[in-house]
Amino acid sequence: MSRSGDRTSTFDPSHSDNLLHGLNLLWRKQLFCDVTLTAQGQQFHCHKAVLASCSQYFRSLFSSHPPLGGGVGGQDGLGAPKDQQQPPQQQPSQQQQPPPQEEPGTPSSSPDDKLLTSPRAINNLVLQGCSSIGLRLVLEYLYTANVTLSLDTVEEVLSVSKILHIPQVTKLCVQFLNDQISVQNYKQVCKIAALHGLEETKKLANKYLVEDVLLLNFEEMRALLDSLPPPVESELALFQMSVLWLEHDRETRMQYAPDLMKRLRFALIPAPELVERVQSVDFMRTDPVCQKLLLDAMNYHLMPFRQHCRQSLASRIRSNKKMLLLVGGLPPGPDRLPSNLVQYYDDEKKTWKILTIMPYNSAHHCVVEVENFLFVLGGEDQWNPNGKHSTNFVSRYDPRFNSWIQLPPMQERRASFYACRLDKHLYVIGGRNETGYLSSVECYNLETNEWRYVSSLPQPLAAHAGAVHNGKIYISGGVHNGEYVPWLYCYDPVMDVWARKQDMNTKRAIHTLAVMNDRLYAIGGNHLKGFSHLDVMLVECYDPKGDQWNILQTPILEGRSGPGCAVLDDSIYLVGGYSWSMGAYKSSTICYCPEKGTWTELEGDVAEPLAGPACVTVILPSCVPYNK
């Protein structure tokens, strides 16, 4: 109590508890909630005032958008009205121009704009990248000041707290991990700490690992360095652990240094750390074998544009598991700005996660995997039915270091084309740009870093599909001068000639062509009936030896135009796309197993519905740096 003249100020220490208790009751009874959060399809009704008071993300989101407004976007690209999602890192909005009229047959994975254009309240938010379990536990904290954590849930809570910028929850998660570390769980804690950059926690967990490692004999240490996945999160940490083992009994163990160092993959260590942390170790400078290993790694880093041609065990990621990646794509919305997200499917968690961000936004582009590098080619950085915003960009992504570099651009701008790798070359075929449909074909030499033209397609094509089989490139369907076609062409790179093959049974474009077990599968897409777009539901299979197409008995689960497509293990995966019959962009993933003749749908949706993305499979590090 304090006095000032005839006035008295009295403090009630129980008020804050009573206020929080009251808010919790309102939340439990779903009273006066004014915003709905959705994570992994599960809805949570909340109060904006509570969210904004605890989360910098929501505070910025709600304050930067008045009660009525257009699309919602945040710095992390998480929040968007459920029925008007916008791509992440959206540029400042400009006055919308009416979309240009699209001629029948124009290759597009998008319908006419009939989406929301009128202002609406921001009261439905899809939190992309947040798990429903993690969000529920974070909301429990916001309304009760208590959070229930376990080693099974702390990673999801930690991820949500960092995405939504709630440092109090992050601090509680870190404290929980630090308190829980034991000899039984230090490996699990170390992995979580590495994923989220928790240096203090990582050091505490590594103490248990080091104590175990120092007691190993030479054979056990050698086996540890060969193990997959590795016991620590980085190659540098593996090197430092090896040095500790050698130094623990230097007189006896130093003879094993060359043998152990051969098992390390020094090219996976960034060049600055090779100089500062590796070269500074005495035996790396004095032992001839170790000197050569270090020199080879430094030479690898000195030639970044040729790294995809210089792959060896020393630069190979320590994993054998390929993962499904989704790159870019066009979300719904009146501004039609493509995504710049690269997402991967976590098969253990059954969810899509954000891996990294492209240097630019792109849709209707191509992605080609070369020695576990991703080459992203062409596409368009803004939707236009006439190819006005097509690009000739070429970028390369390195999952070893989560880094991008720009490569020489294609000689022509292209979107809705096909790209592939054959031996030491990349090929880009057809497509469209501001001049119209393209028949030109370009070839990129992976060793010399140069583009050149090769024999053109017999006809200009866009929105076609392609595949590589037995050293030849097959191109099916597409749009030719506004008409959907069933054509199949085969390119022989040795002879530099194109040959016409048996037509498909169905005209289709914006579809996919995948190779499995010496067969080509044409899946999805659409065609025109009059002026109406119809989903192609039939799945066709082509036998290159017999030059024959057959219609399979199992049609696609639902219409998909412009999905991402990749083959992984024994299945063909289609991600996203547009369904003309449903009038909706898709965020789900369906897969077809030719051996069983069955379709299934994967658990978990991508960050937002997309058409015109690209799919590919790559090997990622065991500790993926997502959501950093």
UniProtKB/Swiss-Prot annotation:
Ranges of compositional bias, category Low complexity: 84-96
Cellular component aspect of the GO annotation: actin cytoskeleton; aggresome; cytosol; endoplasmic reticulum; endoplasmic reticulum membrane; neuron projection; neuronal cell body
Record SMART domains: BACK (SM00875), BTB (SM00225), Kelch (SM00612)
Residue spans of the Kelch repeats: 323-372, 373-424, 425-471, 473-518, 520-570, 572-620
Domain BACK: 210-279
Entry keywords, A to Z: Cytoplasm, Endoplasmic reticulum, Kelch repeat, Membrane, Repeat
InterPro entries attached to this UniProt entry: BACK, BTB-kelch_protein, BTB/POZ_dom, Kelch-typ_b-propeller, Kelch_1, KLHL14_BACK, KLHL14_BTB_POZ, SKP1/BTB/POZ_sf
BTB domain location: 33-151
Sequence segments annotated as region (Disordered): 69-115
Pfam families recorded: BACK, BTB, Kelch_1, Kelch_KLHDC2_KLHL20_DRC7
UniProt-annotated location(s): Cytoplasm, Cytosol; Endoplasmic reticulum membrane
Complexes and interactors: Interacts with TOR1A, preferentially with the ATP-free form.
Protein name, entry field: Kelch-like protein 14
Organism field: Homo sapiens
